[in-house]
Curated annotation (Swiss-Prot):
<keyword id="KW-0576">Peroxisome</keyword>
<keyword id="KW-0816">Tricarboxylic acid cycle</keyword>
<feature type="binding site">
    <location>
        <begin position="158"/>
        <end position="160"/>
    </location>
    <ligand>
        <name>NAD(+)</name>
    </ligand>
</feature>
<keyword id="KW-0329">Glyoxylate bypass</keyword>
<dbReference type="InterPro" id="IPR010097">
    <property type="entry name" value="Malate_DH_type1"/>
</dbReference>
<dbReference type="InterPro" id="IPR022383">
    <property type="entry name" value="Lactate/malate_DH_C"/>
</dbReference>
<dbReference type="Pfam" id="PF00056">
    <property type="entry name" value="Ldh_1_N"/>
</dbReference>
<dbReference type="InterPro" id="IPR001252">
    <property type="entry name" value="Malate_DH_AS"/>
</dbReference>
<keyword id="KW-0520">NAD</keyword>
<feature type="region of interest" description="Peroxisomal targeting signal PTS2">
    <location>
        <begin position="10"/>
        <end position="18"/>
    </location>
</feature>
<comment type="subunit">
    <text>Homodimer.</text>
</comment>
<dbReference type="GO" id="GO:0031998">
    <property type="term" value="P:regulation of fatty acid beta-oxidation"/>
</dbReference>
<dbReference type="GO" id="GO:0006097">
    <property type="term" value="P:glyoxylate cycle"/>
</dbReference>
<protein>
    <recommendedName>
        <fullName>Malate dehydrogenase 2, peroxisomal</fullName>
        <ecNumber>1.1.1.37</ecNumber>
    </recommendedName>
</protein>
<dbReference type="Pfam" id="PF02866">
    <property type="entry name" value="Ldh_1_C"/>
</dbReference>
<dbReference type="GO" id="GO:0080093">
    <property type="term" value="P:regulation of photorespiration"/>
</dbReference>
<feature type="binding site">
    <location>
        <position position="122"/>
    </location>
    <ligand>
        <name>substrate</name>
    </ligand>
</feature>
Length: 354
């Protein structure tokens, strides 16, 4: 009988949390009184924009990451549904959902890593810069929340245009007095994933064996694959270089056009974001030699931000690597990339300083 009593109490507790009344009473969407806390030692991760195309798949992938103990899913719509769904996966991370601006602070408090895929995606005919008008304000608001509630968190910024949203985030953090350049990382991992895939196709290799550094930024000509530095060392014909560079630079547009109005890359992007977040968490844990490309504050060129390989450690991007030797084709590409990047960075900075 004692056992039955305990079990009944447990069931009553759980059922109570399933009622809409209780959900409404709770400031967060979760199961606060349940015993099952996962109990994993690990990191606390928030996804802002978790109900979107990228956000949903990314939530699934982060729920599967053994380094995550607590996963906060925030969005202005549909966060409860995504949270309920993902929370039934029998992996270690405990999942809590947060809906709307009033719950942003709860979503962010105590987080080690904040991943931001919030904002509108492109439709055919648009550039990433066409998203600035709407996404700049979204990123500003969310980063103000980060500065207030988890100023020491690592931020992985996905929302486009990354070439401008990263400078916007930096300015927000500077204004709040919390800016640590090592902790603000623009996510360019999808460019590397595409480059590895397309180069592997040309070379007839497994993409997992290929490593292509992609530097610069995350839009059109600012995406600069360094094919002269591909591992394993490989040579390409001028036609192959032209084909690969164009395909990598226009990979996002290829998906936007194929989706024909239904958005941009979400599945490959969630994969890339999960890979990059995992690298950040391994760095936070103290693993050695965690190296990824990312758009960060940089002294590699005269620009304030630039994507190169960075070494991720306990405090974020602890080392920003130089470009290494470039061939003539890449030197010309670098000048074009810098010209466009300069304007995009300036636009982001001015959005906050105006
Ligand atoms: N860095 C990269 O390599 C890539 C970046 N992106 C960018 O990621 C962003 C998201 O793309 P999708 O997931 O496809 O778009 P989506 O429209 O499917 O999802 C965006 C989500 O953000 C949410 N949202 C809007 N305002 C918000 C706010 N203030 N706070 C929290 N959430 C908010 C929406 O409710 C929606 O659930 C776009 O800007 C897109 O261009 C997309 C692919 C690659
Ligand atoms: O192209 C877009 O709009 C989305 C994006 O950044 C990408 O897929 O690389």
């Amino acid at each position: 009988m004692e056992f039955r009593g305990d079990a009944n109490q447990r069931i009553a507790r759980i059922s109570a949390h399933l009622t809409p009344q209780m959900e409404a009473k709770n400031s967060v969407i979760g199961r606060e009184n349940c015993r099952a806390k996962g109990g994993n030692p690990g990191f606390k991760v928030a996804i802002l924009g978790a109900a979107g195309g990228i956000g949903q798949s990314l939530s699934l992938l982060m729920k599967m990451n053994p380094l995550v103990s607590l996963l906060h899913l925030y969005d202005v719509v549909n966060a409860p549904g995504v949270t309920a769904d993902v929370s039934h996966m029998d992996t270690g991370a405990v999942v809590r959902g947060f809906l709307g601006a009033k719950q942003l602070e709860d979503a962010l408090t105590g987080m080690d890593l904040v991943i931001i895929p919030a904002g509108i995606p492109r439709k055919p005919g648009m550039t990433r810069d066409d998203l600035f008008k709407i996404n700049a304000g979204i990123v500003k608001t969310l980063c103000e929340g980060v500065a207030k509630c988890c100023p020491n968190a690592i931020v992985n910024l996905i929302s486009n245009p990354v070439n401008s949203t990263v400078p916007i985030a930096a300015e927000v953090f500077k204004k709040a007095g919390t800016y640590d350049p090592k902790k603000l990382l623009g996510v360019t991992t999808l460019d590397v994933a595409r480059a590895n895939t397309f180069v592997a196709e040309v070379l007839g290799l497994d993409p997992r064996e290929v490593d292509v550094p992609v530097v610069g930024g995350h839009a059109g000509v600012t995406i600069l694959p360094l094919l002269s530095q591909v591992k394993p060392p490989s040579s390409f014909t001028p036609q192959e270089i032209e084909y690969l560079t164009n395909r990598i630079q226009n990979g996002g547009t290829e998906v936007v056009e194929a989706k024909a109005g239904a958005g941009s890359a979400t599945l490959s992007m969630a994969y890339a974001a999960a890979k990059f977040a995992d690298a950040c968490l391994r760095g936070l844990r103290g693993d050695a030699n965690v190296v990824e490309c990312s758009f960060v504050a940089s002294q590699v060129t005269e620009l304030a931000f630039f994507a190169t390989k960075v070494r991720l450690g306990r405090t974020g991007a602890e080392e920003v690597y130089q470009l290494g030797p470039l061939n003539e084709y890449e030197r010309i590409g670098l000048e074009k990339a810098k010209d466009e990047l300069a304007g995009s960075i300036q636009k982001g900075v001015e959005f906050i300083r105006k």
